[in-house]
């Protein structure tokens, strides 16, 4: 992969842009699938327990919207997986044995499970018993959640690669422990934080659609009961999302400290570091962090970041400059400087090339074990050998800084929203005098999606320049393609995904607009 040191930078940019485009569009559909699956399961359970036609009609209505969204999620997800082979073939070669395993399990087990039971859920109302149909609805949601588990396991491994070992004979990383990969603490935290956030989106969606009906004075009983269920789901999910987000922050601080420093625009670390609430970070320019100091017009919570990252008020949190220059940890171990890591990375690349050359000439060469041992020592810094300048190791601070605040700010607002609408739904009679609340529900829907996408932006852009944290930089993961061809497919996908999005929104709006509970009976 040494030729990748001179690869066209525009190819990397277009490949990243295309993957980001596909992922962002895909994530517009996935969270609603997971969120609605839970709520429609609860509604059908109400039908099973009461036998009331009202609950059956309500469950069928939300299942129709679920179906439209489910189909779009599948379509965009398939394209996303193919991009690993087309645009990121070096990545696929280097770690395909590990990364491919959870994706294969997801496709063989989880996707077939949800695809099977979603058919029963849609077409089995008059053909199977109420109990079997209820089980099919819940199993559809369970299958979708299991799919999310394996996909998030794969993504978490990119953030925190464990359970693997580099084989110099094949120039590939090979899995040494499936359980370490599947049950990585990073994967567990990421799964619960992501899935609980999708329940929030599902709850907001139900509140927004129900709010529209109440504004139009239509299907008011269905809307009221839907809001009651959605508000409870939303409150519980919001609390869980915040709690799991806290756990995730600790893991990020331990395994991706540069990401945390970028999220906080923290240039110089220390003990008892404050958490920035707001600051004036230029969104169009990487700040000059080398001069130290802090972002202008900063309002911060004393000791907040240390509490968030270490759960200690006086905990040490490294800043960008600490990570670039090297520092001594609390346990006495030393974090190498950027230049030291880059030097050891270049040595690993050189040692690997020498090992391969000797192995090809004489597989019994006595120098091979010594080279293999040296490579093993330097392999943790292998990816740094492809970094030309220490500045490349710093993610784009403005995007990470603002995206994190959008995620947290909207998340906090959502908690307040669910508390208010839940109070109105359960303690008062929802009437036209709460029109402002229904309008608020409609406004919260796009804000919720914005927060969800912002979370993924922090997760992925904050990892840059790495495709796999500390192991493989993006520049070494990309396929050797013409940048023009990738640019062309970028705009092709942009048009295709936009058409799919417009089609979904149009179909959903038509289903919502044309729904009439009396005609369903």
Residue ranges of each PLM-predicted region?
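Polytopic transmembrane helical bundles with strong interfacial aromatic enrichment
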Residues: 2-521
């Amino acid at each position: 992969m040494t030729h990748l040191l001179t690869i066209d930078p525009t190819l990397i940019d277009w490949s990243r842009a295309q993957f980001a485009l596909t992922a962002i569009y895909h994530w517009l559909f996935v969270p609603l699938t997971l969120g609605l699956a839970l709520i429609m399961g609860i509604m059908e359970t109400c039908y099973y327990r009461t036998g009331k036609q009202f609950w059956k009609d309500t469950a069928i209505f939300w299942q129709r919207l679920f179906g439209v969204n489910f189909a779009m999620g599948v379509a965009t997800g398939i394209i996303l997986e193919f991009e690993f082979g087309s645009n990121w073939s070096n990545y696929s070669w280097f770690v395909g044995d590990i990364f491919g395993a959870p994706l294969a399990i997801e496709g063989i087990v989880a996707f077939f499970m949800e695809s099977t039971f979603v058919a029963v859920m849609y077409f089995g109302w008059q053909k199977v018993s109420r109990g079997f149909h209820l089980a099919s609805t819940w199993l559809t949601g369970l299958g979708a959640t299991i799919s999310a588990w394996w996909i998030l396991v794969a993504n978490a491994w990119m953030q925190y690669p464990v359970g693997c070992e580099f084989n110099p004979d094949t120039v590939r990383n090979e899995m040494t422990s499936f359980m370490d990969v599947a049950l990585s603490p990073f994967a567990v935290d990421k799964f619960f934080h992501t899935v609980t956030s999708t329940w929030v989106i599902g709850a907001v969606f139900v509140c927004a659609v129900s709010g529209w009906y109440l504004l139009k004075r239509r299907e008011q009983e269905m809307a009221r009961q839907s809001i009651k269920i959605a508000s409870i789901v939303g409150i519980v999910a919001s609390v869980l999302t915040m709690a799991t987000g806290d756990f995730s922050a600790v893991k990020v601080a331990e395994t991706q400290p540069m990401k945390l420093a970028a999220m906080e625009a923290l240039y110089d670390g220390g003990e008892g570091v404050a958490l920035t609430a707001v600051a004036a970070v230029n969104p169009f320019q990487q700040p000059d962090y080398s001069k130290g100091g802090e972002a202008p017009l900063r309002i911060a919570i004393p000791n907040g970041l240390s509490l968030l990252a270490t759960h200690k008020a006086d905990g040490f949190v490294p800043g960008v400059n600490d990570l670039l220059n090297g520092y001594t940890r609390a346990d006495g171990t030393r974090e190498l400087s950027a230049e030291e890591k880059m030097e050891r990375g270049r040595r690993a690349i050189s040692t690997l090339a020498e090992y391969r050359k000797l192995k090809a000439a004489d597989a019994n060469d006595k120098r091979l074990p010594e080279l293999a041992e040296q490579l093993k020592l330097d392999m943790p810094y292998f990816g740094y050998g492809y970094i030309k300048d220490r500045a490349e190791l710093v993610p784009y601070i403005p995007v990470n800084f603002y995206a994190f605040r959008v995620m947290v700010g909207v998340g906090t607002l959502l908690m307040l929203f669910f508390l208010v609408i839940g109070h109105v739904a359960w303690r008062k009679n929802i009437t036209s005098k709460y029109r402002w609340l229904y309008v608020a529900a409609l406004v919260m829907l796009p804000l919720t999606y914005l927060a969800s996408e912002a979370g993924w932006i922090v997760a992925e852009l904050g990892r840059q320049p790495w495709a796999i944290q500390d192991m493989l930089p993006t520049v070494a993961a990309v396929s050797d393609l013409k940048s023009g061809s990738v640019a062309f497919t970028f705009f092709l996908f942009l048009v295709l995904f936009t058409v799919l999005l417009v089609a979904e929104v149009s179909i959903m709006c038509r289903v919502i607009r044309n729904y009439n509970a009396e005609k369903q009976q």
